[in-house]
Each structure stands twice: as C-alpha cells, then as structure tokens.
C-alpha cells in the first residue's frame, strides 16, 4: 500500500491517467496512510498551481420555489423546508454583492439563481448587472443559473461573464436516485454548450448523498474527460425536510480521500472547497487546503459559512498567496 501511494504524484505528473481501479484503491486506503496520500495529492497541486489560492463568493440572487426535486436541496418546492422564497433581486443588490465579494478579497463572484433555468428576462437583467460590475470592480463574474442555451450564454459572455457553474453532482448511475425531474444527460449537455461558446467551466459534486466509491471515481473520471476548469467540492449538510435529512455526515478522513482522488484525477483543474467544508472537515480543514487551491468564502446559498477572516488567516498560516484583482493563476509550472 505504501509503495502504491508514494508513486501516485510521479505517475500523474508524468502524464499518466490513473485507472478506475487506482481510484477505488485510493478511496479504500486505510486511515493510517492518509497523511501520505495527502502529501502525494499536495505535490500535484504544488507542481501545477504553486502556492496560489483563490477566494470566490456568491450571491443567492433568486431563492427557493424550485420546480426540481434534488434530494439534498432546501430550495426545492417539493419539500417542506423552512426557506424564504424570493424572485431575482434587483440590479442594485447584484452590484452590491460584487462589492462585498471584493471586500473579502474574492477574485470571483458568482450570481446564483434557483430553478431549472432562468427566464430570458432574468438572463437579460443579470447581463445588465454584470456589465456594470465588470466595468467598475476588480472581480471576475460567474453565473449559476441552471440549464442554459447557447443564445443566453453568448449574451452573458458578451456582458462580461467568463465562467459558468453547472454541477453534475454525482455519477450518471446514482443521479436518478437523487434527482428525477431532469436528467444527467441534460446537465452534461449544458456543460458541453458552455464549452462550445468559449466560457470557462465550473462543475463539481456533492458527497455524502448515498454514493458508492464507484460513483465518486466515475464522477472524477467524467470531469477529466471533459477537461473542466474548476471543480467545486461540496459535502452534504443534511437539511430537515429533505429526503436526505437522515444521512450521516462524512468523516473528515473520508472527505480527504475524496479530495485527494479528485486532485490526482484532475491535476489541471482548480479544486474548490465549498459547501459543508467547515462541518465535515472540522479540524482537518487546513489539511484539505494542502490539496485544494480555491475556497468559497463568505457563506453559501442557504447556509452561513465561517468568517472570511478565518480563511485569510488559514492562507497565511499555510504560507500560501491570495490572487485578487481579476488575476488568473500563474502559468502552470509543469505540463500534465
């Protein structure tokens, strides 16, 4: 086992694509070897991204009343969750959200709306706000607005959006157990359309939703095939009223194995610690940042996060460097 782990970073950095069997073996590594696994994943992060870290921040621009039945989500209208539903917030609030993002040193600001897809009018309103933001504030703008077509993506791109978030969440096999109101294929086609119009892709998963090791490896493999730019890692916080309210939290050790797997399978992708990171990683949060190079700061859609100052302290403590002012990560130190 030790020999297998010690060779992982070298294999990846030499251009080898780890196999499904490798992935399953990584997830089954005994906890006593976890430090060694983290070291290998960290070597890959450092070789590709160096010591740079990016904060991103979001605004919950339209909340609740969602027609979809994602089993983990508080915003679905199918479940009796205590949520304050509201329509798309006005332009002023979208711009103020970007100002707040800049104030906490976020380099990216994501406008997120509930629902299967945004209406044409909503897309136009978002594009109008994005123009003002990109003209006046040093922050990159992303959107997460559900299923979106090529026409709307081109409008958003022209307004200044440079990245779109659309998560596959889990494997194709497990997806139907989590969502029934739309298909995995539909989400996959949206991601491919985003790539077709030349926008950056941010697409990740949520873990702790009843998936198997095979589901996790399959998702990491799909993102490798798609060559996505950013992978947000979310960990379930069971929400009362949703079908997954009784799910057990993942252990920090399990989370670290998943994060390591995604880094080793997707060395060129930004790895972004997002929802549930504080509760699930607990005292291993700094350890996870040895592997990741991005953090969702300032809170999530329906849950508060930890104070942004704590994340900044963590970056300093680890000897890492924040990128701000619309900077991109420096040129990769190695080609993978």
Curated annotation (Swiss-Prot):
Q: Which cysteine-cysteine pairs are annotated as disulfide bonds in the entry?
A: none
Tell me the route in metabolism or biology where this protein functions. Answer: Cofactor biosynthesis; biotin biosynthesis; biotin from 7,8-diaminononanoate: step 2/2
Q: Name one Pfam family in it.
A: BATS
Question: Which GO molecular function entries does the Swiss-Prot or TrEMBL record give?
Answer: 2 iron, 2 sulfur cluster binding; 4 iron, 4 sulfur cluster binding; biotin synthase activity; iron ion binding
Matches recorded under InterPro entries: Aldolase_TIM, BATS_dom, Biotin_synth/BioAB, Biotin_synthase, Elp3/MiaA/NifB-like_rSAM, rSAM
> Domain of life here?
Bacteria
Protein name per Swiss-Prot or TrEMBL: Biotin synthase
Q: Which organism is this protein's natural source? A: Persephonella marina (strain DSM 14350 / EX-H1)
Protein's gene = bioB
């Amino acid at each position: 086992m030790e020999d297998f782990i010690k060779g992982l970073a070298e294999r990846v950095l030499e251009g080898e694509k780890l196999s499904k069997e490798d992935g399953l073996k990584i997830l089954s590594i005994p906890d006593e070897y976890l430090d060694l696994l983290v070291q290998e994943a960290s070597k890959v992060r450092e070789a590709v991204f160096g010591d740079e870290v990016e904060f991103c921040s979001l605004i919950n621009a339209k909340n609740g009343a969602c027609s979809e039945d994602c089993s983990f989500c508080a915003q679905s209208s199918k479940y009796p969750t205590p949520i304050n539903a509201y329509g798309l917030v006005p332009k002023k609030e979208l711009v103020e959200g970007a100002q707040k993002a800049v104030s906490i040193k976020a380099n990216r600001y994501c406008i997120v709306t509930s629902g299967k897809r945004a209406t044409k009018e909503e897309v136009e309103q978002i594009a109008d706000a994005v123009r003002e933001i990109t003209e006046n504030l040093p922050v990159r703008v992303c959107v997460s607005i559900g299923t979106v077509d090529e026409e709307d993506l081109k409008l958003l791109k022209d307004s200044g959006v440079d990245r779109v978030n659309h998560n596959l969440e889990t494997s194709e096999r497990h997806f139907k157990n989590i969502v029934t109101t739309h298909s995995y294929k539909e989400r996959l086609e949206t991601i491919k359309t985003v790539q077709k119009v030349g926008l950056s892709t941010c697409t990740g998963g949520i873990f702790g939703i009843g998936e198997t090791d095979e589901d996790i490896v399959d998702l990491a493999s799909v993102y490798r095939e798609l060559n996505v730019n950013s992978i947000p890692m979310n960990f379930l916080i069971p929400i009362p009223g949703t079908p997954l309210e009784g799910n057990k939290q993942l252990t920090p050790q399990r989370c670290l194995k998943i994060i390591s797997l995604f880094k080793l399978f997707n060395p060129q992708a930004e790895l972004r610690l997002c929802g549930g990171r504080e509760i699930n990683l607990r005292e291993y949060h700094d350890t996870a940042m040895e592997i990741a190079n991005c953090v969702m700061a300032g809170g999530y859609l329906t849950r508060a996060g930890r104070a942004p100052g704590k994340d900044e302290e963590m970056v300093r403590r680890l000897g890492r460097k924040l990128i701000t002012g619309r900077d991109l990560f420096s040129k990769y130190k190695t080609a993978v």
